[in-house]
Regions:
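Short basic helix-loop element that most often maps to the first helix and adjoining turn
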Residues: 4, 9-48
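Hydrophobic protein-protein interaction segments
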Residues: 113-133, 137-305
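Short amphipathic recognition helices of helix-turn-helix/homeodomain-type DNA-binding modules
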Residues: 1-18, 67-110
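Amphipathic, well-packed alpha-helical segments that form the structural scaffold of globular domains
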Residues: 16-23, 90, 94, 120, ...
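Recognition helix of helix-turn-helix/homeodomain-like DNA-binding domains
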Residues: 32-36, 42-43, 49-66, 76
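An N-terminal domain-cap segment
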Residues: 26-39, 99-114, 119-121
Length: 305
């Protein structure tokens, strides 16, 4: 497994994994009983993409820099890439042009007050901002109350900021908190994989992937699958330590805070009339109470004698 974002090994492994999942029958090609490979051969992908076998072989070996968008589109169609995978392939092509550059520590984007005001205005929904590395960089009181196992985890950084990937793969309690832990793990690894193609020189991102690969066999197996997600929506089931089982719909919205760094606004809501809605409302009451208790007391100036 190649950990170098944008490297030839990354491109090779991604294209080979996508080639292996397509059968000749799915591609409309003749099959043979003596066939030794489960997926498509390189020459078959070349035929489907309208390029020579030699050219596609060179592409799959990682020589992707300078390849035209037309050709990349043809390869994406031949491999039946979805929209996220196609974007990922194009990001890999872009990043391969800068593969020799030294990684740098990217300065975090400051969340402006207007975004925090927006978060705080959503009192009955859990809302937080997540960057491409899956750091939670801002949130409303209900998000902190709902995700309390994550905020209280030993995996938070020195500023008390949780990282979703680090919590899921390095905190044993995550298996209890996320009812469908496997789905959460698959999605989180896929989000990180998309980010390494967008930001191949982000040193903190490389360090995170290296840390997870070293310490978590579960992360390694999911990383090796080369699944990609640009954004993640759906339904999540949580086992909260105070209110019990919650089934929540979550929506991910692009939040434009800078021209380069990716930030998503994540909103968790409950279906009206359900037990989960009642439990989320209870958490919202607790969150509001704790938030008021944490606010400093403002003393009005006393009138003079």
């Amino acid at each position: 497994m190649d950990q170098q974002p944008g490297s030839r090994g990354e491109i090779r492994d991604f294209l080979a994994s996508r080639r292996a999942r397509i059968t000749p029958a799915q591609a409309g090609l003749p099959t043979s009983a003596r066939r030794r490979v489960a997926g498509l051969r390189r020459e078959e992908v070349a035929v489907l993409a309208g390029v020579s076998t030699e050219w596609y072989t060179r592409l799959e070996k990682g020589h992707i820099g300078g390849v035209s968008e037309v050709v990349l589109d043809a390869v994406a169609r031949a491999l039946r890439l979805d929209d996220d995978e196609r974007t990922y392939l194009f990001d890999l092509a872009r990043s391969s042009r800068h593969v020799g550059r030294t990684p740098t520590r990217r300065r975090d984007v400051e969340v402006p007050p207007r975004v925090q005001w927006l978060l705080d205005s959503m009192t009955t929904s859990s809302a937080f901002v997540r960057n491409g590395r899956t750091d939670i960089v801002a949130g409303n009181p209900l998000a902190r109350t709902l995700l309390v196992p994550m905020f209280d985890s030993a995996t938070v950084d020195k500023h008390g900021r949780p990282n979703i990937a680090r919590y899921i793969f390095l905190d044993p309690g995550a298996h209890d908190f996320f009812v469908d832990w496997d789905a959460a793990g698959v999605a989180t690894a896929a989000l990180l994989r998309a980010e390494v193609a967008r930001e191949p020189r982000d040193r903190a991102l490389r360090e995170l992937v290296g840390e997870l690969s070293t310490l978590s066999p579960e992360f390694r197996s999911r990383w090796a699958a080369h699944d990609v997600l640009m954004r993640h929506d759906g339904v999540k089931q949580l086992q909260h330590p105070e209110v019990g089982h919650l089934e929540l719909a979550f929506q991910s919205l692009n939040l434009h805070l800078s021209d380069r760094a990716v930030h998503d606004l994540i909103i968790y809501t409950a279906e009206p009339g359900t037990a989960s809605e009642d439990r989320l409302k209870l958490l919202a009451i607790w969150a509001a109470t704790q938030s008021r208790a944490a606010q400093p007391i403002r003393h009005s100036p006393q009138p003079g004698p």
